[in-house]
């Protein structure tokens, strides 16, 4: 305001020139100044005046973002004084006049729609809008009252009549003008449905005339409902661009309406109102009773003020005679006077207050309820599927006509109509049960009337919208989406109990798809845990959703015990960024490399465990959400109180986590709900259940406090996961640590590479394809430094040899492989391709256990020249990475290593027969089971035979029957002779005639000899780091040797005896399986057993140790050939299970 403005001087809210121009146009439009005072007379140029008024609205208000013209038109009473009389005159006798039709169209289309457009208050509006909006909202209520009830003129029917010619034209022949007329007619109906009395403005007795009931009655009487039903049922065919406007009209007609009351009969509605009145009277009586306990007497109504001396010697003042009763009442009065000025966070300003308000209940009179129920039933029968299918598709493809608010309106309308359909079915069943018709005449309706919102597309759209709203913290949208999801679940639950088999199958399929996704479970849990201060409506929606979802999921999981869900977890991978800079400076590029972590979804199925899922709701945040809802217990109905009771009962007694409820404020709330003051109504049926629950909970709390007095201190605070389990059960939760397993060992496909250089090329190409160039560069640097170090040692040793020719040659020291950083150290354990490359460049791992952080070394037998050759190969492959062949990537040329030795060695022991020789099994026909071969060898032989047969099919002629029979007889004779040798060698051996004392003496003598030899080899490997190359070569061939070799069998027998002393009885299943952990030639880097820690040579080369031991036993490599008739099972092997010898029954 201007400072020079005199006191009492009026403020011009509108420019006087603008007001003068607008008033002159309204005056020139026409009036009631003719001979007949009840008849409106148009001015000489009324059509031009209407166009000028529209031009002022568009070029002044819209262009300058002001509301001056709209206010001037409201002050001049343009709508009720001019426009509505013009429409009335056209309806009563001038419908055939083209001039009057154009004027009527101008009144409706060009002026009524902008003047009745909803006004929304938001934070960014200018001061001019804030000055005019209260007045314009008041004027719009007057506009609505005039449109709904103007004498005997049905103005809504007149407005619809103006648009009928445009509707009669087919969609293909409809012009842009026709589409605009239809759209503006629907917008006018939408504006009428939205306009309501503002509670902050002074009312003038027109609340009933502009209420929701009056709107619904006018829509029914003037055929607006018939128009809406016609257009909704033909959406997509004749009307494609009007879907969003129709949705808004339907939304504003049904929002806030109680579905249960809507479908009640007159008798039920009257009984309901009687019950509500009785409940209000009982509340009033209880309040009076509470007041009467502490009310003053007739002669003691004087003011009272007392001082209360507290424990800390401070004084507090309390007023009122009710504090004189006792100390408890005084303290309670003090608590009521306390206020906690909690700092409030700035709330996000909603741009559309009118459209968000679907939580406020709306009361309808009986006539309006009947009219709206008729419209809803006809809409469900004809217009539900077309409208909501078309709206969903438009929202999904983000059409231009779609606004942000339409998604919220869509989900709320779907939820409301689904509840209406379920309520209608209940009323139909009740009506039929009360009728005199036979039950067999009643045919249940199918759920196909609402099938458009029960398909997979709707579920995907709903889940995506819920996740987006939750991430963006759009709580109003999430509220509507939660309501929709809840009603879908309840509808599916009713479909499952339908007598129609088709509905039951559809319900089963829908439940399977809803509960299959674990992301849905996690989202509902996150919504419940994420409640903060979103309001009562949001709190009601999220608690109802969690209650219904848990109940249905529990029932479904019990009916489907083998229920599977798809679990999605994040698997991190590193992706190298493209480097920019000088290409020649390779070292600088390597040092400046950056890595970006990306998360990709990895999906897998797993068995669903309902107890595990329900336990996720046992946390303090979920409990706080339901406690916040319980604080409204005075306003909650029986269903809501039952929902709270079921959750708290599940927490305290089903999940055995009652300690979560042991908090002072929660216990105080439960106590006040039962004992008061201001407790629950004891006449409600749910009161008894709550009373028993609170009694049992307090009893358990007292018992827990007696057991663990520390709980008294914990009652002041929320429980945390680290102490919650101990407070409940009295001991810490036992957890099992899971160690990381090494990745599966990879090899290069033999068909793709034969030489080591080709294998290195393929592995490096695969690493480069994965963006692991840094690891290859690090490996090249390790080889370079190792070559320099080895070369320096060789030069030093050569110089020492020249000085002292008799000096023995010192072995090369092992060179440790040091990772560059922690990521590289992790890759050395978890990256299977890098481990394969390290093995190809002759690196070796120290120790038996393959664990994170295991040491790798450059072995002693590699010379500096060998290391430089390997480095040159790696550098060449890194400079020009292998890109693969035409149809195969380098990664496809790698495969998992097939453990042939283990399977081939373990198989014979599983095929040993333990039958009694004296029972007739030693007949020629059943000498012994066929020669057991390893699975891997048999598979390879079978593949070779098949390939040979395929190659020779076209060359050789088919054999005759005589030749085939001769070959079969020869095979049988050969097999019989081989089985005889195996049986005699296995069951008859030299140890049968020996006594136990002699066997023990021989065993200990061999053990002492072997221990000395092993200690000497360990000492040489640790101190000198040298193992003969001959031992390596011999060891490799010996590892391929079958354990049927007599020397190996004899040696393994002694080791097996030692194993019997070390392996506990619990491992008898492992022994019977045929796996012997320490058998020579059978050990692998991946196996783990208790016997690996028996020796002190964990830091020695396991590979060299085995090869040297094998070379000592087997001699030269040339003697390692096996005869075809050599038995597979070791002749001297003794096997035990639980202390019993099971090699032979004769012993």
Curated annotation (Swiss-Prot):
Q: What GO terms in the biological process aspect are recorded for it?
A: DNA repair; DNA replication checkpoint signaling; meiotic cell cycle; replication fork arrest
Query: Which segments show compositional bias classed as Polar residues?
Result: 907-916
According to the UniProt entry, its GO molecular function terms are: DNA binding
**GO CC annotations, alphabetized:** replication fork protection complex
Biased region (Basic residues) positions are 566-575
Composition bias, kind Acidic residues: at what positions?
A: 584-597
Q: Give compartment(s).
A: Nucleus
Pfam families attached to this UniProt entry: TIMELESS
- Source domain of life: Eukaryota
InterPro entries associated with the record:
Timeless, Timeless_N
Annotated segments matching region Disordered:
564-598, 799-823, 898-1002, 1027-1147
Composition bias of kind Basic and acidic residues appears in 950-992, 1054-1063, 1096-1106
Write the record's keywords in alphabetical order, separated by commas: Cell cycle, DNA damage, DNA repair, DNA replication inhibitor, Meiosis, Nucleus
> To which protein family does this belong?
Belongs to the timeless family.
* The protein's assembly and partners: Component of the fork protection complex (FPC) consisting of tof1 and csm3.
According to its UniProt entry, the function of this protein is described as: Forms a fork protection complex (FPC) with csm3 and which is required for chromosome segregation during meiosis and DNA damage repair. FPC coordinates leading and lagging strand synthesis and moves with the replication fork. FPC stabilizes replication forks in a configuration that is recognized by replication checkpoint sensors.
Q: What is this protein called?
A: Topoisomerase 1-associated factor 1
Taxonomic lineage from the root: Eukaryota, Fungi, Dikarya, Ascomycota, Pezizomycotina
Q: Gene name, please?
A: tof1
């Amino acid at each position: 305001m201007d400072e020079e403005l005199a006191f009492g001087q009026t403020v011009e809210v509108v420019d006087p020139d603008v007001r003068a121009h607008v008033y002159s146009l309204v005056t020139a439009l026409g009036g009631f100044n003719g001979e007949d005072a009840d008849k409106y007379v148009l001015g000489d140029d009324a059509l031009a005046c209407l166009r000028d008024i529209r031009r002022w609205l568009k070029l002044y208000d819209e262009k300058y973002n002001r509301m001056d013209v709209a206010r001037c038109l409201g002050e001049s009473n343009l709508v009720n004084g001019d426009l509505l009389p013009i429409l009335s005159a056209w309806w009563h006798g001038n419908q055939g006049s083209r001039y009057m039709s154009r004027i009527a169209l101008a009144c409706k289309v060009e002026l009524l729609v902008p003047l009745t457009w909803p006004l929304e208050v938001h934070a960014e509006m200018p001061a001019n809008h804030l000055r005019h909006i209260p007045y314009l909202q008041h004027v719009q209520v007057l506009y609505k009252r005039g449109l709904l009830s103007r004498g005997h003129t049905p103005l809504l029917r007149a407005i619809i009549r103006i648009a009928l010619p445009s509707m009669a034209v087919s969609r293909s022949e409809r012009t842009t003008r026709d589409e605009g007329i239809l759209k503006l007619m629907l917008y006018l109906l939408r504006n009428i449905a939205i306009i309501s009395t503002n509670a902050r403005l002074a009312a003038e007795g027109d609340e009933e005339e502009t209420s929701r009931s009056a709107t619904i009655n006018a829509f029914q009487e003037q055929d607006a409902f018939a128009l809406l039903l016609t257009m909704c049922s033909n959406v997509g065919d004749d009307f494609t661009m009007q879907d969003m406007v129709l949705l808004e009209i339907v939304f504003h007609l049904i929002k806030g309406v109680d579905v249960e009351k809507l479908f009640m009969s007159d008798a039920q509605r009257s009984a309901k109102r009687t019950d509500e009145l009785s409940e209000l009277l009982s509340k009033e009586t209880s309040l009076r009773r509470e007041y009467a306990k502490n009310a003053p007497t007739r002669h003691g109504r004087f003011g009272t003020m007392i001082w209360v001396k507290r424990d800390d010697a401070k004084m507090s003042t309390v007023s009122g005679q009710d504090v004189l009763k006792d100390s408890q009442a005084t303290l309670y009065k003090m608590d009521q006077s306390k206020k906690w000025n909690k700092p409030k966070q700035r709330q996000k300003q909603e741009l559309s207050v009118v459209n968000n308000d679907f939580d406020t209940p709306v009361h309808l009179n009986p006539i309006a309820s009947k009219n709206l129920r008729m419209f809803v039933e006809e809409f469900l029968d004809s217009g539900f599927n077309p409208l909501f299918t078309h709206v969903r598709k438009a929202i999904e493809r983000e059409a231009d006509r779609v606004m942000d608010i339409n998604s919220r309106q869509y989900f709320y309308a779907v939820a409301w109509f689904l509840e209406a359909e379920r309520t209608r079915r209940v009323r139909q069943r009740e009506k039929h049960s009360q009728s005199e018709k036979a039950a067999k005449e009643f045919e249940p309706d199918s759920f196909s009337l609402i099938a458009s919102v029960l398909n997979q597309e709707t579920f995907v759209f709903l889940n995506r919208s819920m996740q987006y709203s939750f991430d963006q913290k759009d709580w109003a949208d999430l509220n509507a989406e939660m309501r929709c999801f809840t009603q879908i679940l309840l509808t599916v639950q009713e479909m499952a109990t339908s007598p129609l088999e088709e509905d039951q199958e559809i319900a089963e399929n829908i439940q399977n798809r809803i509960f299959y996704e674990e992301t849905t479970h996690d989202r509902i849990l996150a919504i419940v845990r994420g409640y903060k201060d979103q309001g009562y409506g949001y709190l009601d929606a999220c608690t109802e959703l969690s209650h219904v979802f848990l109940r249905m999921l529990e029932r479904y999981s019990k009916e489907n015990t083998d229920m599977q869900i798809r679990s999605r977890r994040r698997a991190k991978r590193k992706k190298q960024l493209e480097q920019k800079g000088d290409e020649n400076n390779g070292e600088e590029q390597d040092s400046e490399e950056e890595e970006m972590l990306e998360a990709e979804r990895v999906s897998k199925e797993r068995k669903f465990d309902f107890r595990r899922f329900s336990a996720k709701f046992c946390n303090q945040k979920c409990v706080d959400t339901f406690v916040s809802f319980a604080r409204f217990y005075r306003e909650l109905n029986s269903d809501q109180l039952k929902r709270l009771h079921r959750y708290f009962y599940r927490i305290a007694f089903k999940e055995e986590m009652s300690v979560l409820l042991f908090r002072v404020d929660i216990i105080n709330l439960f106590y006040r709900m039962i004992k008061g003051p201001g407790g629950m109504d004891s006449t409600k049926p749910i009161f008894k259940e709550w009373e028993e629950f609170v009694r049992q909970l307090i009893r358990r709390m007292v018992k827990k406090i007696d057991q663990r007095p520390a709980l008294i201190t914990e009652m002041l605070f929320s429980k945390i996961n680290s102490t919650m389990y101990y407070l409940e059960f009295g001991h810490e939760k036992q957890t099992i640590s899971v160690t990381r397993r090494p990745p599966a060992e990879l090899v290069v496909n033999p068909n793709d590479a034969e030489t080591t250089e080709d294998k290195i090329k393929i592995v490096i190409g695969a690493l480069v394809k994965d963006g692991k160039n840094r690891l290859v560069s690090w490996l090249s640097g390790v080889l370079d430094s190792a070559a320099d170090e080895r070369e320096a040692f060789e030069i030093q040793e050569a110089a020492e040899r020249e000085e002292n020719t008799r000096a023995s040659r010192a072995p090369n020291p092992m060179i440790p492989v040091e990772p560059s950083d922690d990521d590289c150290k992790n890759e050395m354990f978890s990256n299977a391709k890098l481990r394969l490359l390290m093995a190809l460049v002759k690196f070796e791992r120290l120790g038996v256990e393959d664990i994170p952080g295991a040491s790798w070394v450059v072995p002693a037998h590699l010379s500096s020249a060998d290391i430089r050759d390997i480095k040159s190969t790696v550098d060449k492959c890194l400079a020009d990475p292998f890109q693969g062949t035409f149809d195969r990537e380098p990664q496809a040329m790698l495969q998992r290593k097939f453990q042939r030795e283990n399977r081939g060695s373990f198989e014979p022991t599983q095929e040993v027969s333990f039958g009694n020789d004296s029972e007739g099994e030693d007949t020629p026909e059943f000498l012994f089971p066929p020669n057991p071969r390893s699975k891997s060898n048999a598979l390879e032989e079978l593949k070779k035979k098949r390939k040979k047969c395929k190659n020779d099919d076209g060359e050789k002629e088919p054999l005759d029957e005589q030749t085939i029979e001769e070959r079969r007889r020869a095979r049988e004779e050969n097999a019989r002779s081989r089985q005889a040798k195996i049986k005699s060698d296995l069951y008859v051996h030299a140890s049968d005639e020996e006594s136990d004392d002699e066997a023990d003496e021989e065993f200990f003598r061999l053990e002492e000899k072997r221990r000395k030899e092993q200690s000497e080899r360990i000492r040489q490997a640790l101190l000198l780091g040298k193992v003969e190359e001959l031992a390596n070569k011999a060891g490799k061939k010996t590892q391929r040797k079958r354990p049927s070799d007599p020397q190996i069998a004899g040696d393994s027998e002694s080791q097996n005896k030692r194993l019997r002393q070390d392996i506990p009885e619990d491992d008898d299943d492992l022994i019977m399986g045929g796996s012997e952990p320490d058998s020579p030639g059978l050990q692998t880097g991946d196996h783990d057993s208790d016997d690996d820690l028996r020796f002190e040579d964990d830091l020695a080369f396991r590979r060299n140790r085995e090869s040297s031991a094998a070379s000592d036993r087997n001699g030269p490599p040339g003697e390692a050939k096996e005869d075809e008739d050599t038995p597979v099972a070791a002749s001297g092997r003794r096997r035990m299970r639980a202390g019993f010898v099971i090699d032979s029954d004769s012993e």
